[in-house]
Every structure is written in structure tokens, then in C-alpha cells.
């Protein structure tokens, strides 16, 4: 299991939400897709082409440790710890800001932008920097070519 990223209380504060329940396990990652959710992940119920709120109960069935949902979400049987916010995307952005603020002042962040070649460039940077600083380089597992890729 991964080391816990958040306590439930810190998650609620960072998201600017209201707690509904308590998280029964360490919160170790994030997911916006129940197909890739791992036990302990925090599920974020985003609305896009589909409404993530339709998948909250499924996320808990797959082991989600908590979910960030709209304040208007109606709790279902089987739901676990909820963080109720006005807008789940804004809540996720708050969590991202809080996570970034936890970085050491010595940490460096590299952003790769553009219309072609981002994934290859990211992977090349990760490989090169990992040689210089083994175990100290972090990169997204995949590209998130959307508005929540780097909230």
C-alpha cells in the first residue's frame, strides 16, 4: 500500500468542504474514474460528459477511502466518507493547491505544455532526472489532456 497522502480532516479542509462521516482507511491517491480506482483512493465526482455522482457508490464498493461530492449529493446506502463541496472541481483545485504548498522549498516543478510531444518530453525528463536523483522524481502515470490535468 502507498503511504497515506491525506488525513480525512486535512482533505476536508483543503477541499473547503464539510465532512460527512469518517474515512476508515488511509487516503493514498485520487481517482476521477472508477475503472482505475484503487483501494484507499479519494474519488472525485466531476461532471463532464457523464456525472461522476452516478459512480460514487460504485467507487466505495471498489474500495474508495472517501469521495469529494457536490453539497447537493444525496447519500446512498453503501457510501462512505464524503467531503461535500459547492463544486467538486473547485474542491479538487483546493486540494491541489494544498498539496503543492506541502512541497519542500528546495523542490522544483517542471510543467510541459504545447500541442505535440508533451508525453514523450515528460517521459524523457523523468528518465534523465531519475538518473541524477533516484527516488526523488515524480511524474504523472499518464497524460491528462484536459482542464483538470493540472488543477
Language-model features: locations:
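Phosphate-binding loop of NTP-binding sites
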Residues: 91-151
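N-terminal leader/targeting and accessory segments in enzymes
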Residues: 1-94, 98
Amino acid at each position: 500500500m502507498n503511504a497515506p497522502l491525506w488525513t480525512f480532516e486535512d482533505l476536508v479542509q483543503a477541499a473547503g468542504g464539510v465532512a460527512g462521516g469518517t474515512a476508515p482507511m488511509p487516503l493514498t491517491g485520487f481517482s476521477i474514474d472508477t475503472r482505475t480506482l484503487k483501494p484507499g483512493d479519494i474519488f472525485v465526482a466531476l461532471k463532464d460528459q457523464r456525472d461522476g455522482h452516478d459512480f460514487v457508490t460504485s467507487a466505495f464498493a471498489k474500495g474508495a477511502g472517501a469521495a469529494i461530492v457536490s453539497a447537493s449529493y444525496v447519500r446512498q446506502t453503501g457510501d462512505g466518507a464524503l467531503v461535500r463541496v459547492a463544486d467538486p472541481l473547485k474542491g479538487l483545485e483546493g486540494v491541489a493547491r494544498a498539496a503543492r504548498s506541502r512541497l519542500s522549498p528546495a523542490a522544483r516543478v517542471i510543467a510541459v505544455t504545447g500541442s505535440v510531444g508533451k508525453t514523450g518530453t515528460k517521459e524523457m525528463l523523468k528518465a534523465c532526472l531519475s538518473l541524477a536523483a533516484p527516488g526523488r522524481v515524480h511524474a504523472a502515470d499518464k497524460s491528462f489532456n484536459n482542464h483538470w490535468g493540472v488543477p
